């Protein structure tokens, strides 16, 4: 073992945390808590825009369900208990008083149904993202950091709220 490897191993923290578990081992409750916390983090970072944009997480298992925010709530109002569980067809699968934004469902169901390794999907409305999206030519890869997105950006026509 190299000296660097020994230092890394010596500084390793054995903390039992849901963020360090294998995704397949996470319970729905843990995913709800993490997703609600993620909504608050996105709000804190200034990446939210009113009620628009969505964060979703796929629930492990054969049912192909995922959690999404209730339509009409601001990001800082989303809680673990008011997240809505839906299937890939947009059906709400547990009793709730909330609806789901159809545009959010369209975007996230497309990703969750086609990318089995995309456990969590984020669609935000940052100022920088909205500015880029308004450009006729879309994302221009003019520097090193932008090159990470070369041939990796997909566009979807707006289907309305």
Model regions: which residues?
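Glycine-rich flexible loops
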Residues: 1-161
């Amino acid at each position: 073992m190299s000296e660097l490897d020994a230092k890394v191993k010596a500084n390793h923290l054995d903390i039992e945390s849901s963020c360090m578990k294998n995704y397949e081992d996470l319970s729905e409750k843990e995913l709800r808590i993490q997703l609600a916390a993620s909504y608050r983090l996105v709000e804190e970072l200034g990446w939210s825009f009113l009620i628009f944009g969505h964060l979703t997480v796929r629930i492990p298992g054969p049912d192909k369900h995922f959690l999404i925010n209730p339509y009409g709530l601001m990001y800082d109002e989303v809680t673990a208990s008011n997240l809505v569980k839906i299937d890939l067809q947009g059906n709400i699968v547990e009793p709730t008083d909330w609806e789901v934004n159809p545009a959010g469902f369209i975007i996230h169901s497309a990703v969750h149904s086609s990318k089995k390794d995309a456990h969590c999907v984020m669609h935000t409305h940052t100022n920088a993202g909205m500015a880029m999206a308004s450009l006729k030519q879309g994302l221009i890869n003019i520097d090193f950091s932008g090159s990470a997105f070369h041939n990796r950006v997909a566009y979807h026509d707006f289907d309305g709220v």
